[in-house]
């Protein structure tokens, strides 16, 4: 069975606001590939390790739902649906970029040879689809950018082995898209330091707690999201780092 277009969305929030008038089917990519196991020999084992990690780290029910809601539908894109185009709806922050790089890697490695494009928000919405109306999302679709998944695959491969220098070098070589990806690549480098105390997220939270004279997580989280929007972290990711900052200072 062939489907003309498959839209792979970056999360449930976008799924809720996604324009119904756009042609094709949708798949929500519920992952967090900035953390946890990222090296894979083959995809079945990789997805199994991801389901176990997310279940242990976030929600025990994920282990049961992961295959039905993510890995099996993703496999069907390349084995059954075989669309003429896959549209990737991902923002420019690192959280989304890591997922974007992996999906491109998956498509290439699975033998997909159709068209791939990137429907990305821009301007003040570059890190947040939620700022856009349905009409604006339609415009994002119309302005989608062509993607060479062979080049983006290399970004996943470099990041999955924590080679920040190679990641940045590769991004700089993708001249048509580098301006949109380089901030996330630099943020990745600044996060993957030899100790967490040297990392940019840690140092930013340390500065926030000192300048605002607060150990209140809610306030620190809001300030971090504003200062370091390029990371796209959720509250759980920030809370882990925040707790280390507070513990170190006490």
Predicted regions span which residues?
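Short acidic, hydrophobic short linear motifs in intrinsically disordered regions
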Residues: 213-224
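Short, conserved secondary-structure transition motifs
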Residues: 119-137
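A short alpha->loop->secondary-structure connector
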Residues: 102-116
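Charge-enriched amphipathic alpha-helical scaffolds
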Residues: 203-204, 225-250
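Long, hydrophobic/aromatic-enriched structural stretches that serve as scaffold segments
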Residues: 58-101
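A structured, charge-rich N-terminal accessory region that forms the first stable segment of a protein
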Residues: 1-63, 69
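A conserved mid-domain beta-alpha-beta active-site/ligand-binding segment of alpha/beta enzyme cores
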Residues: 131-211
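A short acidic (Asp/Glu
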Residues: 16-20, 38-39, 96-104, 127-131
């Amino acid at each position: 069975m062939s489907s003309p277009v498959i839209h792979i969305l970056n999360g449930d929030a976008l799924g809720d606001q996604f324009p119904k008038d756009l042609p094709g089917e949708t798949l929500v990519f519920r992952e967090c590939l900035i953390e946890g196991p990222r090296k894979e020999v083959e995809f079945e084992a990789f997805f199994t390790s991801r389901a176990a990690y997310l279940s242990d780290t976030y929600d025990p029910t994920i282990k049961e739902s992961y295959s039905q809601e993510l890995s099996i539908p993703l496999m069907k894109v390349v084995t059954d649906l075989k669309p003429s185009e896959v549209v990737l709806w991902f923002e420019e922050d690192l959280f989304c970029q890591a997922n974007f790089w992996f999906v491109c890697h998956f498509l290439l490695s699975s033998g997909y040879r159709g068209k791939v494009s990137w429907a990305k928000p821009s301007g003040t919405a570059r890190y947040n689809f939620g700022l856009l109306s349905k009409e604006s999302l339609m415009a994002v679709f119309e302005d989608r950018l062509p993607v060479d998944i062979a080049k983006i695959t290399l970004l996943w491969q470099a990041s999955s082995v924590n080679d920040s220098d190679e990641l940045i070098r590769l991004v700089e070589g993708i001249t048509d898209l580098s301006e949109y990806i380089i901030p996330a690549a630099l943020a990745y480098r600044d996060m993957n330091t030899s100790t967490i105390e040297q990392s940019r997220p840690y140092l930013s939270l340390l500065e926030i707690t000192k300048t605002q004279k607060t150990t209140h997580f809610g306030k620190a989280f809001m300030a971090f999201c504003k200062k370091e929007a390029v990371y796209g972290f959720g509250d759980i990711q920030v809370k882990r780092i925040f707790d280390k900052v507070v513990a170190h200072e006490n």
